UniProtKB/Swiss-Prot annotation:
This is Probable fructose-2,6-bisphosphatase C732.02c. It comes from the Eukaryota. ATP binds at residues 16-24, 127-132, 307-310, 351-355, 387. The active site is at D88, H214 (tele-phosphohistidine intermediate), E285 (proton donor/acceptor). One of its GO terms (molecular function) is fructose-2,6-bisphosphate 2-phosphatase activity. Coiled coil: none annotated.
Length: 408
């Protein structure tokens, strides 16, 4: 994108009222783009936003003066290699947007507005509660005090609110009630279309994602990678106990959907669960290519150069005829899109796959993904919130080998 006419990068500017779900959408977009290897910077605009709010009648010259430091900073950020910068403003006036357009154009930045609108009062109330309890700007204050501050700010911003319109001749997407209505105007490139596709899949429902590797397999016991081996005796015990621990973990089989890969060991692990099951080939384990069925010791002794390459850059290293972690992330993109639309889902699959999914929800760096510890016979519950993902773990008391390997 930066090679196009010397453009610095893409600035995605979120606008809309507080408690509309705007901040949640901005943070999720930042997490998604980072996970997809797009260098992304989420800019904290809170102080500027407050300044603009206190001077809501500022003329264009004063607006530009207030906003210029942000774009001066973004110019530096883009020159250091960032591809996308995300801004999150409560302002939604025509005068404000014109200033943003002029500042971005003067610095040769692509600009895309995202207006987030919520008309569902129940969702607005839930978002206000979430802000009071978890926002770094409100959680230190008494709940009622925070709530009143947020309600007052909504009232003030509503006075000057002007929705985006096609007459403005700028790139934008207007999202009403999380995809119930979607207006897209003047997209200019593939990345913008991917952003719209992702945002259109976001939902507000509170839900959890449960993760578990398959039960211990014969290949796990033998120290081999890849393959499509069956469960070991210990793995079969884990599968038999899984329904009991699903119940203990307050998952409940009613309304729960279980996703597995197409491989035998995950299907065997899920067979005692009395709920809807879906097989996804996209959840199959990382393809080890010509090394499939080998142990790590065998690879290091017989293919030392390959072992060294993988140890030096585990995320990008691709097995001959196989995959890298980066390939797996690309393969999992449709899974992530579907997870954003779903309710409670229990995913039973493989170590590399779960590392990538786990890393997405915890917003971990790509370099960290290949080293995340996802033990056998452990259930991980992830509950995504606006400002963090809450995690709980339960270990099922069936012993299993460890397949965790540290950095070399």
């Amino acid at each position: 994108m930066k090679d196009i006419e010397g453009l610095l990068g893409l600035c995605v500017c979120f606008v809309g009222l507080p408690a509309s779900g705007k901040t949640s959408s901005a943070m999720k977009l930042s997490r998604y783009l980072t996970w997809m290897s797009v260098s992304t910077h989420l800019y904290d605009t809170k102080e500027i936003d407050n300044s603009l709010s206190e001077n809501s009648n500022s003329d264009s010259e004063n607006l530009a003066k207030t906003l210029s430091p942000i774009f001066d900073n973004l110019e530096s950020v883009f020159k250091k290699g960032t591809d996308v910068a995300i801004l999150d403003f409560n302002q939604c006036t025509l005068k404000f947007r014109k200033s943003i357009v002029e500042l971005a154009k003067a610095r040769n930045m692509l600009l895309m507005f995202v207006e987030v609108v919520c008309t569902n009062q129940k969702i607005i109330d839930e978002n206000i509660t979430d802000m009071c309890q978890h926002s770094p700007y409100f959680k230190s204050f008494p709940f009622e005090e925070s709530k009143n501050k947020i309600l007052d700010s909504i009232h003030e911003y509503e006075k000057h609110y002007t929705p985006l319109s096609e007459a403005e001749e700028c790139t934008f997407v207007r999202i009403v009630d999380f995809g119930a209505e979607l207006i897209v105007h003047k997209l200019e490139n593939y990345l913008e279309s991917r952003i719209v596709y992702y945002l259109s899949n976001l939902r507000t429902r509170r839900r959890s994602i449960w993760l578990s590797r398959h039960g211990e397999s014969q290949f796990n016991v033998e120290g081999k990678i890849g393959g499509d081996s069956s469960l070991s005796p210990q793995g079969l015990k884990y599968a038999a106990l899984l329904p009991e621990y699903v119940a203990k973990f307050s998952i409940g089989e009613k309304g729960l959907t279980v996703w597995t890969s197409s491989m035998a060991r995950t299907i065997q692990t899920a067979r005692h669960l009395n709920c809807q099951k879906l097989e996804w080939r996209a959840l199959d384990e990382l393809d080890a290519g010509t090394c499939d069925g080998f142990t790590y010791d065998y690879i290091e002794q017989n293919f030392p150069h390959e072992a060294e390459l993988r140890n030096n850059d585990k995320f990008h290293y691709r097995y001959r005829g196989g995959e890298s972690y980066m390939d797996v992330v690309r393969r999992l993109e449709p899974i992530i899109m579907e997870l954003e639309r779903q309710g409670d889902v229990f995913i039973i699959c493989h170590q590399a796959i779960l590392r990538c999914i786990y890393g997405y929800y915890h917003n971990l760096s790509l370099e960290e993904l290949p080293f995340i510890n996802v033990p056998l016979h452990t259930i991980i519950k992830l509950t995504p919130m606006t400002y963090e993902t809450i995690e709980e773990r339960v270990t099922v008391p069936i012993s299993a080998v460890s397949t965790q390997r540290g950095k070399h």
